[in-house]
A protein has these predicted regions:
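Charged, often Cys/His-bearing segments associated with DNA-binding zinc-finger transcription factors
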Residues: 1-39
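Basic, short loop/linker segments at the boundary and entry of helix-turn-helix/winged-helix-like folds
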Residues: 28-68
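Polybasic low-complexity intrinsically disordered regions
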Residues: 58, 85-88, 107-347, 352, ...
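Alpha-helical support elements that line or immediately flank enzyme active sites
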Residues: 67-77
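Short, positively charged loop/turn segments that connect secondary-structure elements
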Residues: 92-113
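Helix-centered, glycine/charged polyanion-binding patches within enzymatic domains
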Residues: 361-390, 410
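Basic polycationic patches enriched in arginine
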Residues: 387, 402-405
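Short, low-complexity, charge-dense intrinsically disordered segments
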Residues: 392-402
Length: 410
């Protein structure tokens, strides 16, 4: 049964009055007061209503407080157990979440409840709505000037094992076989000796010397191809995510060649031919690969800035994407997203990759001036034909030359 409070309605008596004026003053000058007064009631608890019955069953935990708990845990960088302890015992957290009752029902949350709520937020895609609501509330509260902003990306390492090609094949095939055994036991049993090869007890068979890795990869490619072909007509199995990962792995890592007597022969692609958006780990199929930063994701972040140090900076745009995505493709979507929130800049600082000619022209059409360094190769190719002539890009070239010039030893 749905349980929510109206957090915009004040209590007749202050439930925290017992703390005394000095401790109350500390609370009211902390982040907890800002969260309680400006953010808590803006959280999208109504988007959870369809998951619960309005009248039947046991009451849920207070849904605004649960969403707030998920946010504050990330904000304070707490472990699950620390978050649970703070929810139950920390006055500042209880004040921020407007927990005014002292019963275990109101002031305690189990690990499973916290896990489920975090999973719901991710599966329902509520993070975008939460960000938009909080950003709108803070921008109005702080009356910030969004005209000057900066954009950059930060790499995020996924919480997954970094697998070489052999381990990637083994992990993907083993994951498929595990799910096949769980849901289609007869089909699993009919595979015979293959299932024994991919038992965890047989891991030593895949620890090969570097000189033997090419041969082992071909064997793994053959097994992958065999499983893909064997079950491609089985509708229920082809709907399994682990089977889709198997198909994706084979398409990205292998090619099928025609052998003797018109038979199919599996060949392994060269490493240089593997796309950066290929499967990195079946446990996290959305992760990508960046040759500069590694495996995982990257986050595009755009925020306001001001020469006035008393003005806070506000993040106006966030987008998480696979690590293989280029920064060059992120500029225009970031500007358009900020415009949809009425927080668009007029001047935007960005790194070199964002500052392509195409991006600068498109941004100009959107009313935004992009300031970005010129690539070194481009700067070095600019040649002045005379001291009096100035052509497009000259000023940028001069600024780059000033940046690149070595400091005078004197």
């Amino acid at each position: 049964m749905i349980h929510v409070k109206d957090h915009k309605q004040y209590d007749m008596f202050n439930p925290f009055e017992h703390l005394g004026p000095k401790r109350l003053a500390l609370l009211e000058s902390s982040w907890a007061h800002l969260f309680r007064e400006e953010i808590l009631h803006k959280l999208p608890a109504e988007k959870l209503f369809h998951l619960y019955d309005e009248f039947k069953g046991r009451k849920t935990k207070e849904l605004y407080a649960m969403l707030g708990l998920v946010i504050i845990q990330q904000m304070e960088d707490c472990t699950d157990q620390d978050a649970i302890d703070n929810f139950a015992l920390n006055i500042k957290w209880q004040y921020a979440l407007n927990i005014t009752e002292t019963s275990d029902v109101a002031s305690y949350v189990s690990p499973r409840t916290l896990w489920n709520m975090r999973d719901i937020v991710a599966r329902q895609g509520l993070q975008d709505t939460i960000f938009e609501n909080v950003t709108a509330a803070l921008s109005k509260l702080c009356t910030l000037d969004p005209s000057k902003q900066r954009l950059d990306s930060v790499h995020i390492f996924s919480n997954m094992a970094h697998l070489g090609r052999i381990r990637l094949f083994v992990r993907t095939i083993r994951t498929f076989l595990t799910n096949l055994k769980r849901h289609h036991g007869k089909d699993y049993d009919n595979l015979g000796e293959m299932v024994l090869r991919y038992d965890k007890k047989s891991d030593g068979a895949f620890a090969v010397k570097p000189t033997e890795s090419a041969k082992k990869l071909v064997e793994l490619g053959d097994d992958c191809f065999y499983l893909v072909e064997r079950f491609k007509e089985h509708e229920a199995i082809t709907r399994m995510d682990s089977y889709k990962h198997l198909v994706r792995l084979f398409a990205e890592q292998c090619i099928v060649e025609k052998g003797e007597n018109n038979t199919s022969k599996v060949a392994i692609k060269a490493s240089k031919d593997i796309s950066s958006d290929s499967l990195q780990n079946p446990s996290d199929p959305g992760a990508g690969y960046c040759g500069h930063k590694g495996k995982g994701y990257q986050m595009q972040v755009m925020e306001t800035y001001s020469k006035d140090k008393t003005q806070p900076n506000l993040i106006t745009h966030i987008k998480v994407e696979p690590a293989n995505q280029s920064d060059a493709n992120a500029l225009i979507p970031a500007i358009e997203d900020a415009q949809s929130k009425e927080l668009a800049p007029t001047e935007l600082l960005a790194d070199t990759l964002y500052g392509s000619d195409s991006n600068i022209e498109q941004a100009k059409e959107l009313g935004v001036t992009v300031i970005a360094p010129v690539e070194i190769a481009m700067a070095s190719s600019l040649v002045f034909q005379s001291r009096d002539s100035v052509f497009p890009g000259a000023l940028c070239a001069l600024s780059v030359q000033r940046v690149l010039r070595k400091p005078d030893p004197s």
